[in-house]
Amino acid sequence: MGLIQHKREAYWFYRFLSLGYDRWVNPLFWTPEMRAQALQEARLDDAGLTVVDVGAGTGFTTAGIVARIDAANVTMLDQSPHQLARSRAKPELERCARVLGDAETLPFDTDSFDRYVSAGSIEYWPDPERGVAEAYRVTKPGGTALLIGPVRPANRVARALARAWMLFPPAHEYERWFTAAGFADVKLTKLAPRWYRNEHVPYAIAVSGTKPRPGPSPAQLPPRADPPAGPLRFAARFVLGSAAGAAFVPIAAVLSLRARRGRRR
């Protein structure tokens, strides 16, 4: 489990990351082109659909959703009040509902939403299988769930940093989790920013599936287990995990500059 892959550690990580999330993180790691490609798999084909965006953060993914769906039908959920507060500065999200909550214990009734979307959130979940089972539970029968997350890097240095930071599963794990949760027609879509050049290992995955019948997920899950750490362990996790995560920014920035120079030649 990654050092920031815990509820309290992730809460404080985003307390600080929210200050520059839209300026530094999205342009490098979760671009408008990636968002558009991923949201195609959510089947946002009717403005009247009800949609929940789990791990909505500052609303970057939500902005892509409300370009197709009436904002009054969209619910943004996040455990970080600081991220959600930043989303209020975006006028297109003014009519969205905002809920503080846990992706692994969603505060919604079973069969509540036509569409479930979650982008860049699963990597912080201590129990990703439980989170996917919750995605199944709150989606209406016949509805679609879409989850976007990172993939284990091919580069050894990046892989070591990723392992220290948070959850970076191999692509096939996403498919396994969706299938085990009960979703049908499970599909994987590879995503990458323009600077990413590895054709053999995807940068990120969008996994989608359809809920075939009403009710909760048939997945058999063990009891929840993410006991809070003591002060020293928490501090060590937070500092070391944040440092590992911060290292990705200059790496991505350098690769992005190289890619831009290559396109100009």
Regions found by a protein language model. Name each.
Residues 1-45, 60-64, 83-86, 154, ...:
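Conserved class I S-adenosyl-L-methionine
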Residues 50-105:
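Class I SAM-dependent methyltransferase SAM/SAH-binding core
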Residues 104-115:
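A short acidic, Gly/Pro-enriched loop at the edge of an enzyme's catalytic core
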Residues 129-141:
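A short glycine-rich, Lys/Arg-flanked "PGG" loop and its adjoining helix->strand segment in the class I
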Residues 142-149:
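Conserved beta-strand signature within the Rossmann-like core of class I S-adenosyl-L-methionine
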Residues 149-166:
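Short, glycine-/aromatic-enriched active-site segment of Class I SAM-dependent methyltransferases
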Residues 167-182:
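Short alpha-helix
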Residues 194-232, 264-265:
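Core SAM-dependent methyltransferase catalytic element
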